[in-house]
Amino acid sequence: MRNENEEMEKYFPHPLEKFKYCPVCGSSRFEVNNFKSKKCQDCGFTYYANPCSATAAFIINDKQEMLVVRRAKEPAKGTLDLPGGFVDMGETVEQGMLREIKEETDLDVKEIQYLFSSPNVYMYSGMGVHTLDMDFLVPVHGDVPAIKAADDAAEALWIPISEVNPAEFGLTSIRNAVIRFLQQYKIR
C-alpha cells in the first residue's frame, strides 16, 4: 500500500506543505518533524496530518439493482458516483453514511454493513485532501420509496448490478471500489 501512496504523492503535494505557520502560536518556525507531522520550534506544538473520513454506499435492492448518483459538481461532474461523502465532526462513520444517503437520495435506510476501506486523495478547491474512504453495503428490502436526487447529486438511478460498468464512475477511488465490490461478491 505504501507504493500506491508514494505514487499519489508524485501528483499531489503532501498536505503539510500548505501549512506554513503554527496554528497555536502563529510562528513561522513550523517545520517538518517527519512524514506525517510538523512541529513548532517556538511553542513545541506538533501537528499530525491525518486523513479525513469519507464514506460510500453500495445500496442494493431486492431486484439486485445498485443505486448510483450522477455527480452535479466537479470533480468528475456528470459521471456516476456512489452516494456518500465526508463525515462531519461529531459524527460516527455510520451516522455520516446515513446522513449522506438521506441528503443525496432522500432515502431513509436502517441497515448498513461495513465492507472495506482504502486511502484516497480527493481534489477540493485545488488542494489534494487525503481521505480514508470507508465503503458500506446498504441492503434495502421491499417497496423502496421514490428516490430524489439532491445535494451534490444531479440524478439518482437504479442499475442492475450485472450492468454496472466501473468505467462510468468518474472518481478513481470510487471506480476502484466498484471493481473491488464486483470482484469480492463475484458479480463479474
Model-derived segments and their meaning:
Residues 1-18, 145-188:
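Nudix hydrolase/Nudix homology domain
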Residues 30-31, 48:
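Short functional micro-motifs and their immediate structural scaffolds
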Residues 31-37:
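Short linker/helix segments within small regulatory modules
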Residues 42-66, 86:
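Conserved N-terminal beta-strand and adjoining loop/helix that marks the start
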Residues 9-12, 61-103:
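Conserved Nudix-box catalytic region and its N-terminal flanking loop in Nudix hydrolases
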Residues 15-21, 36, 53:
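Short metal-coordination and nucleic-acid-contact micro-motifs, chiefly zinc-binding Cys/His arrays
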Residues 116-145:
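Active-site-adjacent beta-strand/loop module that shapes the phosphate/pyrophosphate-binding cleft
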Residues 22-25, 40-43:
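Short cysteine-rich clusters marking metal-coordination/redox-active sites
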